[in-house]
């Protein structure tokens, strides 16, 4: 089966949902495959047939890029361990949402939010705790009464009312008892990843150190097509660096991604002494970069 089938399916779904979609990232290693934008919603997507192949380094990049671009990170795949991903179910990989293409289609094209999430032990849903308490009291039913109906403890009912997840069977029984929609939907676009742990990343060569000298906040990537996010005065610069042979393959892709994400793109070339633009991407020699005094000079050059 073609390796392009799944990525092309994901691209088609996002286009069908009227998203602008970036060029597909074909550079290895890569922590994401495409970025899509519609209005204020920005989605960064990693496509992997088997979601267990998505490493901690990949999710580190996805988390970091999503946080600083105010995007939603998603993993789209077909299998986990030895089973197919189920339609309408959200899985978790290193804290990020993972789902199959059908669930992606249902959410972005049909507007149907998933309700079920996979966790060790099976499939679960999250209960609307405040609503459960409200309808239970309206029915004049005590914690003990409801616990007896469900065959669980009073403490468990109290936890449901605090938002604890439960099995599908219990959720169905609750909705039948009270005739109320008690299950929370999972809003993929509203999801924000946890604050990443602070790690001192190594900065190969002098390029990132030079950018820091110019007053920029630097976040090094591990497997992204750009090696760093450089932040300066409300501007974000997708930054790659290396020899001209390596950079030429990245310049166009990074420029395309910057257009979708409304950011800047820059490639620092270690064996080049001048500067020029390839599309929206600034190519600047490492020696030339070293002569700049602060980030505003670099922003002006990118804007030229």
UniProtKB/Swiss-Prot annotation:
Residues of the HTH cro/C1-type domain: 132-189
InterPro entries hit by this protein: Arc_TR_HTH (IPR020886), Cro/C1-type_HTH (IPR001387), Lambda_DNA-bd_dom_sf (IPR010982)
Domain of life: Archaea
Sorted UniProt keywords: DNA-binding, Transcription, Transcription regulation
Keyword flag DNA damage: no
Start-end of DNA-binding region: 143-162
GO MF terms, alphabetically ordered: DNA binding; DNA-binding transcription factor activity
Protein's name in the database: Putative HTH-type transcriptional regulatory protein Memar_2347
Taxonomic source organism: Methanoculleus marisnigri (strain ATCC 35101 / DSM 1498 / JR1)
Lineage: Archaea, Methanobacteriati, Methanobacteriota, Stenosarchaea group, Methanomicrobia
């Amino acid at each position: 089966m073609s390796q392009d089938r799944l990525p092309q399916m994901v691209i088609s779904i996002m286009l069908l949902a009227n998203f602008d979609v970036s060029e597909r990232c074909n550079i290895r290693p890569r922590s994401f495959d495409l970025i899509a934008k519609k209005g204020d919603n920005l989605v960064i997507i990693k496509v992997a047939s088997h979601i267990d192949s998505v490493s901690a380094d990949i999710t580190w990049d996805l988390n970091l890029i999503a946080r600083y671009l105010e995007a939603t990170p998603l993993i789209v795949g077909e299998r986990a361990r030895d089973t197919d991903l189920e339609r309408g179910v959200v899985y978790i990989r290193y804290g990020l949402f993972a789902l199959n293409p059908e669930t992606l289609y249902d959410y972005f094209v049909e507007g149907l939010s998933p309700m079920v999430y996979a966790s060790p032990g099976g499939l679960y849903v999250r209960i609307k705790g405040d609503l459960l308490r409200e309808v239970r009291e309206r029915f004049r039913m005590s914690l003990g009464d409801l616990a007896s109906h469900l065959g669980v403890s009073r403490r468990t009912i109290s936890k449901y009312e605090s938002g604890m997840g439960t099995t599908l069977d219990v959720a169905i029984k609750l909705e039948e008892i009270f005739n109320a929609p008690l299950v929370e939907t999972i809003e993929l676009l509203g999801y924000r990843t946890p604050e990443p742990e602070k790690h001192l990343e190594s900065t190969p060569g002098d390029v990132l150190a030079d950018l820091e000298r110019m007053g920029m906040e630097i976040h090094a990537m591990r497997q992204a097509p750009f090696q760093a996010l450089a932040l300066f005065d409300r501007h974000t610069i997708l930054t790659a660096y290396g020899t001209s042979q390596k950079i030429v393959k990245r310049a166009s892709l990074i420029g395309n991604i910057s257009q979708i994400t409304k950011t800047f793109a820059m490639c620092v070339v270690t064996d080049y002494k001048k500067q020029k633009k390839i599309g929206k991407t600034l190519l600047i020699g490492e020696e030339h970069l070293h002569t700049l005094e602060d980030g505003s000079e670099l922003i002006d050059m990118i804007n030229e």
